[in-house]
Every structure is written in structure tokens, then in C-alpha cells.
Amino acid sequence: MQTVGMIAEFNPFHTGHAYALAQARKLAQADVVVVVMSGNYVQRGEPAIFDKWVRAQAALQHGADLVVELPVTGAVQAADQFAEAGVTALAAMGVNTLAFGTEHPEVAYADLAEKLATAALTGDGFRDYTQTYATQLNAVYAKAAGITQTDPNFMLGLSYAKANLALKRPMTLLPFARRGIGHDEVGIQANIASASTVREYLRADQSVAAIVPTELVDFYAKQQQYSWAQFFPWLKYRLQTAELNELRLVATMAEGLEYRFTQKIDDAQDMTAFLKQVKSKRYTYARLRRLALAITLNMTATAVNQARQHPQLHVLGFTPTGRQYLNSVKHDLDWPLLTKVSADMLAPDGVLAMTHRADRLITTIGGVEQNYGRRPLM
């Protein structure tokens, strides 16, 4: 069966995502669309507005055939690490083609990735503490490969290409033109809105009928929503009670940020105020949110490394076509396939220990078990 894969967050699923899945299937002439989707937490450093099962169900009803979870250890990372986690998971699923939407589909992403593979991406170019890492990285890209575009989906596509280049058997890259408004912009264009706009409408209890598939309007209205508003008290408690040595073990903790975070947390009443207190020219808001989330979830560098060394394929759901594909490849997959979560997987030394640790907050807030005993949606 011809397969095409996409890496997504679907935070939440909307008409632009339905278009993207249809384009991927059409352009790749694929029988099966496989999606590696972020679990309950997303790359911008916050809980997804709906849990992973709600978002997987929406995707399966609107173009995806198989949805596999991108665990928190890969989902809540900077672009290159996020891309590596998603690309390697798709490759492990036996996917032939990697499709992604971009502002610049005309670019030869594989060629650019090869140029960057020989460029020096460390050293003196990253020692300007008055600029973010991303700004300095863009300058290195421009010097090494003549890359001047900085559009977010272009940069993410480039991260996909670099991760794909590192595979033993690289997938075919299939960039296609994005439709509608930019990823983090707010607004609506041709009945396609950014995920940010959809979240804004949902949280304000405004109608999303024009910007999500019809069947999802009532479905979304019945679902528990999640945000930093619910998580901030947990962050505050962690920062007020954890030892500094404990905080230093958290993934992506660097350069004394544990001091800055613990010094500023007492006076902050919400996440927005806290981020303004700790913000500096060196770090983007997304970088700081990711670190704050890692602290809240106690996601240590050790947990991230263990997840990379012992990857799993946790299936969230499939259509009949997806099930047929899964049955045809399950004995040939490079990684263990998980279709039912047992208690031993969630134990402190289990293969889903970090996922379970992170998802327990979602279960506590929303009252819906996220892992134990759950089977794939069908």
C-alpha cells in the first residue's frame, strides 16, 4: 500500500487540516494517510486545548487513516527535536512519503538540508546573549545555504528535511502550499483559520461553524478544554517547593534559569504575568513556556533521553484502511507497537512512564483516563 505521512498537532483540528490531509493523499496518490500527532501537550509549551483522543477522533473522521502519538518528550521541544521525533516515528511505521504544508513549496528542501549538514551550527555564531537562539540560527542558515525565509512552516519543513536526511532510508519529501492564514496568526481567510483563532473562538464560546468541519461543532462544544489557566497553580507549587538541584535535572533547563524562575514565581498571578517577568532577549516566549511545562510535568533530561533510546509506537486510532495497513506491517516495524496500555507500561520504569506522568494532570483536571486500558479508536 502506498503511504503518506504527516506530523501534526491538530490543536484543534479545523478545515485547514482537513484540506492538508486531502492534499497529502491526492499528491502522493496514497492509499493510507498516517499521522504522527502530538499527545496532550504541544510544541508551543502548553496543553492542547482538547485531549489526544478527542483530536485523534476528529482527524480520523476527516482524512487520517492511522494516528500514532508523538509523546510529550518529543512534542514539547524546539523545532529540530520535534521534527526528529516525528520523522523517525513515521519512518518506523514504514511510511514512504512525508508531506507537509509550507509557505514555500517550490524550495528543494532535501538539497538545503544537505547544505546545512556540512555547515557549522555551533560555536561563535551562538554566543550573542542579546539575541534568541532562533535568530542566531537563521543568520547561520543564511550564511551557509543562502536561506533568507523565516516563515514558521518553512523553517519547520527544513527541520523535517534535516531529520529525514539522517535516516538510513529517507522518505520522499512532499511539500505543498499551505492554504489560509499563518500558523500563529489570528484571523480567517476563505473559511480557513489558524489553530490560534479556533482556540480563541472556542475559549470565548464563539461559534466555530465557519472554520471547523460541520460534524465537529457540537462535538467540540461537549469537550473539556485545557490551558495554562488550569496548569499555572501546579507550576507555582513546583517552583515553590522543588530544590534547585531538582530543577536542574529538568529537560532544557540552562544557564541559571532555575534561579530566575524561582525568584519571579511568587508575585505572578497567572502564566502571562510570569512569562513577562522571566522574559529576556535571549529566550523566546515559546522556549520559556516549554521549560515551564517541563517543570510542571517533572520532565527530566533523563526521561527525554530514555524515550529517545526506547521509542514506542502508541496507536491512538485507525480507520478500516488504517487497520488493514497496520496488520500488513506490524511484524516488520522497527519499533514496538502499542495498541493497549497495561499497568506495567505506566510503572516508573515502564515504556510509557513519562507519558503517564504528564497525562495524569490531564486526567485529574478532565476526569478522563488517558492511558490505562485505553484501546485505539475505530
UniProtKB/Swiss-Prot annotation:
The Gene Ontology biological process terms listed for this entry are: tRNA modification
Q: State its Enzyme Commission number(s).
A: 6.3.4.-
The entry's ATP-binding residues are: 7-20, 101, 153, 178
Q: Which Pfam families match?
A: HIGH_NTase1
GO CC terms in record = cytoplasm
Q: Show the GO MF annotations.
A: ATP binding; ligase activity, forming carbon-nitrogen bonds; tRNA binding
Q: Main subcellular localization, coarse class?
A: cytoplasm
Alphabetically ordered keywords of this record = ATP-binding, Cytoplasm, Ligase, Nucleotide-binding, RNA-binding, tRNA processing, tRNA-binding
Which reaction(s) does its UniProt entry say it catalyses?
cytidine(34) in elongator tRNA(Met) + acetate + ATP = N(4)-acetylcytidine(34) in elongator tRNA(Met) + AMP + diphosphate
What InterPro entries does the record point to? Rossmann-like_a/b/a_fold (IPR014729), tRNA(Met)_cyd_acetate_ligase (IPR008513)
Which subcellular locations apply to this protein? Cytoplasm
Family, per entry: Belongs to the TmcAL family.
Q: Which PANTHER family match?
A: TRNA(MET) CYTIDINE ACETATE LIGASE
HAMAP family of this UniProt entry? TmcAL
Concerning NCBIfam families, the annotation shows: PRK13670.1
- Function statement: Catalyzes the formation of N(4)-acetylcytidine (ac(4)C) at the wobble position of elongator tRNA(Met), using acetate and ATP as substrates. First activates an acetate ion to form acetyladenylate (Ac-AMP) and then transfers the acetyl group to tRNA to form ac(4)C34.
Q: What is the protein name stated in its UniProt record?
A: tRNA(Met) cytidine acetate ligase
The protein's organism comes out as Lacticaseibacillus casei (strain BL23) (Lactobacillus casei)
User: Which lineage do the record's taxonomy fields give for this organism?
Assistant: Bacteria, Bacillati, Bacillota, Bacilli, Lactobacillales
